[in-house]
């Protein structure tokens, strides 16, 4: 579509599975991308089948048959007869169901909490002892914070993360650190800088990475400085590769809009900054950018080899930008073990030889009053952001992804798409 407006893209990348740039250049999936997506979507489905089969005591064959038949649109009574649900009730009746489960009388009260308030809750039953810091890294990896009217958009800002990790390294009360990462990656340079900060922190105290639903590409890169990596079987990780998309607006600017350009320069490449605006990218410029990407990929591969104690040849076999599901990642040694955040905290305590410990969140989560003031005052576009979420639904994340394209650094270590599993 962009070509219709006179906008073209030149792709520089390493890794046949690094498919982000297909957004700019192709009208369908490449065979390599279809291969990796089929693999991890199939793996996610098999994990879901196993979990539901065990929980509901329903055979996997039956579940597959239900899925094929669009059971979601069947009569609700069928859901019960097929053991997919236990019963039916209206919203106002759910409290009585919970009370029965808790052994409470119907006239007794129960406290309720919004799921957002417990989404990142930590088991704090042990509030005494040495501190284990839990540091949250969520969103796209960037060099500097980019102000946005879309307020709730989270970022991993390398300058801030480095400063925070240095402070944790110097904090004598903190005996170990858990990095809770949920990110599809981002700026390759920023990922390298955070990697070093993690590595330097790990020299002073154990660092354990706890991967959420996604810790891929640049997010995996920064994890290589840690001592131990934990993920879930359904985590998307790996994606060891780098790409760049060089936009060329010259047709739009000169032919469709009629702008005229001229230049005076002292050296052959003095006018490098005009590439893609007043003229197309030259062959020399494209080759230079490809070499730049190649060096970035080789460095990424080296960091993985060092962090995972592999040879570069071993890394190359599982790299090429391929995204791996947690179950596969464990088998090919991209991660050390399975577990959630509480398991990662326990592992950090073990590595730090702590028998009594408490988890402390960094950066500290905003208090309820601060959140209330943000909502009331529309701080950082929170109100607009929420309205966009409501209006766009599943299209919200792709919208943010497209909006961010113009702000990205040219060389990226990022997951190639927004994943929406339905």
Map each language-model feature to its residues.
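Charged, glycine-interspersed solvent-exposed loop segments at helix/strand-loop junctions
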Residues: 2-97, 250-332, 336, 342-348, ...
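C-terminal long alpha-helix characteristic of the crotonase
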Residues: 54-55, 86-131, 301-307, 336-378
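Active-site proximal loops enriched in glycine and acidic residues that flank catalytic Cys/His/Asp
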Residues: 136-139, 181-183, 211-213, 233-235, ...
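Short, well-ordered loop/turn and helix-capping segments at boundaries between secondary-structure elements
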Residues: 4, 200, 213, 228-231, ...
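Short glycine/threonine-rich loop-to-helix capping motif typified by GTGT followed
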Residues: 188-193, 328-331, 371-376
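Extracytoplasmic
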Residues: 4-7, 47, 61, 66, ...
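Intrinsic disorder and flexible/low-complexity segments
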Residues: 129-132, 136-171, 364-422
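Cleft-lining beta-strand/loop regions that shape enzyme active-site pockets
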Residues: 125-252, 294
